[in-house]
Amino acid sequence: GLPSCLLCLCLGTSVYCDDAGLEHIPALPPDTTYLYARFNRIGAVRAGDFSGLEKLKHIDLSGNSISRADADAFRLLPSLQELLLPQNLLRELPELPRAIVRLDASLNRIASAGLRPGAFRDLKQLQFLHLSDNQLDFIPVPLPESLRSLHLQNNNIRTMHEDTFCDSQEQGQIRRALEDIRLDGNPINLSLFPNAFFCLPRLPTGRFS
């Protein structure tokens, strides 16, 4: 296809492709650090779409029609810190690179079966995990200690474990970072799990009756 700088606006190492009628990820200059390709008609992200883009730090694909992302579409990007995929049609989450700090895949169709077991365990930099307005049945565990913000509102979460957030064997545990948990808009009654929040700086937002 056409080099992205003809279809999009290239400013320094940022590429702006918002609302450009794109159906595929465009070919990007090798030194690209930021990609904004919001509100297009992109339907899939393939394994080779970002190959060789070792400086790419930020990808925003909000408001496309992405129903499929290959397992390796993002995993091999060594510098990727922010991946924004809200308002798409994803049913499962692709593997994530180790450097990821912020993931937003809200307003998709992701069910718990679409998350690999332990999908977030090894993401030691992850601070913001936003999966609101999906079809999740469970809170994904384990969650890395780095996590600051967990948005799971408007899913189908009905239950949780005493150990979901806190280690019940370690009563002195404090998770200082994790101070923003949203579980509102789920069927779960949080008052049924009185011992599940002792390590948190503040209670989750959600139903307590």
Question: Would you name each region that the model predicts?
Answer:
Residues S14, Y34, A44, K55-H58, ...:
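Conserved LRR concave beta-strand detector
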Residues D18, E23, G43, S67, ...:
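Leucine-rich repeat
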